[in-house]
Amino acid sequence: MMTYIAFILSTILVVSFVGFSSKPSPIYGGLGLIVSGGVGCGIVLNYGGSFLGLMVFLIYLGGMLVVFGYTTAMAMEEYPEVWVSNKTVLSLFVLGFMAELLFAGYCISDEKLEIVLNFNGQGDWVIYDTGDSGFFSEEAMGIAALYSYGTWLVIVTGWSLVIGVLVVMEITRGN
């Protein structure tokens, strides 16, 4: 069941990425970003990262809602462009979705397919029972793991947010 949930979430993630990268009206592009962010957090939650999924959901989607509100207010159109208005984008959207379904079906139905993932430090993310003092707090362990093993993730995320803000400021600045 968990495999099916992972495949469904991955398919929705790909569809939402195609949705906002096909550059429809900013209203629909922002909606695609919000859906992809929420589904990405669902994938993190599916693999057991409850604290990280919650933090990404709160920070990323909080920022995206602000950007979504600004782009909606600045680029309001009487007749917004949708995916159906451009036949090429719609056909590529359908073709990519069908390819994703075929690949997912092949991966599920093939008995000989073996996917090997090697996570060397995965045991460090597990919450252990210490015996006499009970369990460690999951939130504290999540923060410790984020800043010890995920230092590069924090740096890349911060840099991406700065670049995103600069791009939005440059686009909305005008002439």
Curated annotation (Swiss-Prot):
Pfam entry (one): Oxidored_q3
Task: Please describe the quaternary structure of this protein.
Answer: Core subunit of respiratory chain NADH dehydrogenase (Complex I) which is composed of 45 different subunits.
Record-given protein name: NADH-ubiquinone oxidoreductase chain 6
Role description? Core subunit of the mitochondrial membrane respiratory chain NADH dehydrogenase (Complex I) which catalyzes electron transfer from NADH through the respiratory chain, using ubiquinone as an electron acceptor. Essential for the catalytic activity and assembly of complex I.
Q: EC annotation?
A: 7.1.1.2
What is its EC class?
translocase
Catalytic activity entry = a ubiquinone + NADH + 5 H(+)(in) = a ubiquinol + NAD(+) + 4 H(+)(out)
Single GO term (MF)? NADH dehydrogenase (ubiquinone) activity
